[in-house]
Amino acid sequence: MKTSHLIRITLPGALAAALLASQVSQAADLVPPPGYYAAVGERKGSAGSCPSVPPPYTGSLVFTSKYEGSDSARATLNAKAEKAFRSQIKDITDMERGATKLVTQYMRSGRDGDLVCALNWMSAWARAGALQSDDFNHTGKSMRKWALGSLSGAYMRLKFSSSRPLSAHAGQSREIEDWFARLGTQVVRDWSNLPLKKINNHSYWAAWSVMSTAVVTNRRDLFDWAVSEFKVAANQVDEQGFLPNELKRRQRALAYHNYALPPLAMIAAFAQVNGVDLRQENHGALQRLAERVMNGVDDEETFEEKTGEDQDMTDLKVDNKYAWLEPYCALYRCAPKMLEAKKDREPFNSFRLGGEVTRVFSREGGS
């Protein structure tokens, strides 16, 4: 009798198994790549004094564009406008850079003072409701998503470290994560439902900030949105590996193709460890884009032919602009030439990706 009962409930075996797998996948906690579980370094010396928290930015997010007055290519900087922009966003960038630096110092040295300082900085901004203004322009909502990616990416190292540094700071952790969740929800509103002609690297960076926030706050809805935005991006990559909306940047087209890669590679790496393989989206679009960029760095002629402009290589001479190579080469078996390019530029440290990218994707870090 028991046997027949078992047979009856297992008759639709394949369907039942598929449904069960789907339910388990949906129920599973979101996780980062393995390197984020790295233990805190052994304590070395004592922490210095905690710098003053940058004033929480609670004002309007209407900022001057550094390209103000430029034509539709948005490729020529306006020095006067850029100076105004840098002044307007100083507290935000000080917060991004400073908090990321404090987390990095703590993870390296294990000095409790650095941890306490980093958490005090973030909780101060959380309690103030910083960066939540509904009054914003394109530049302002761009700053919101960049800051969220920087701060949640750095905080993630504390959240998932096997040393459990946040265990004694439950109240502050809850404040900070609730703030990240509010910002993540706002970033989704800011960057949803754009026409394809308006979707470019900004949307990709927004998706990275939401992916990072999704993992920190275990929000499956945010994770799904980030994945959907990646798919839009992947389907913008043409057969030759170009992004048409970045080709519009003319002399900065190659630089902006490269700038599109860090958020996309990070999203793909985070999706992969959560059971979503994005590598084959649009017939391997991410790989086509990466190879097009690295070929362009070696010889920009193809970009010059596409845009009719000599390429501005200034940004491409900065090693950290290639931080995307770490998550990318964790996803793909990188060719020797690409591995050599990565090795020549390491270690990568990008505050917009949460700090020490090489460390969290290195074999020593656990990946």
UniProtKB/Swiss-Prot annotation:
Catalyses which reaction(s): Eliminative cleavage of alginate to give oligosaccharides with 4-deoxy-alpha-L-erythro-hex-4-enuronosyl groups at their non-reducing ends and beta-D-mannuronate at their reducing end
Keywords: Lyase, Periplasm, Signal
UniProt GO cellular component terms: periplasmic space
Xref: CDD domains: AlgLyase (cd00244)
GO biological process, one term: alginic acid catabolic process
Gene3D superfamilies: Chondroitin AC/alginate lyase (1.50.10.100)
GO terms of molecular function: poly(beta-D-mannuronate) lyase activity
EC number: 4.2.2.3
Pfam families: Alginate_lyase (PF05426)
Location(s) in or outside the cell: Periplasm
Zinc as UniProt keyword: no
Top-level enzyme category: lyase
InterPro entries hit by this protein: Alginate_lyase, Alginate_lyase_dom, Chondroitin_lyas
Major location (coarse): periplasm
Entry keyword annotation includes Lyase: yes
Positions contributing to substrate binding: 65-66, 138-139, 256
Cleavable signal peptide: 1-27
Biological function: Catalyzes the depolymerization of alginate by cleaving the beta-1,4 glycosidic bond between two adjacent sugar residues via a beta-elimination mechanism. May serve to degrade mislocalized alginate that is trapped in the periplasmic space.
Entry similarity comment: Belongs to the polysaccharide lyase 5 family.
Protein name from the UniProt record: Alginate lyase
Organism: Pseudomonas paraeruginosa (strain DSM 24068 / PA7) (Pseudomonas aeruginosa (strain PA7))
Classification lineage: Bacteria, Pseudomonadati, Pseudomonadota, Gammaproteobacteria, Pseudomonadales
Encoding gene, per UniProt annotation: algL
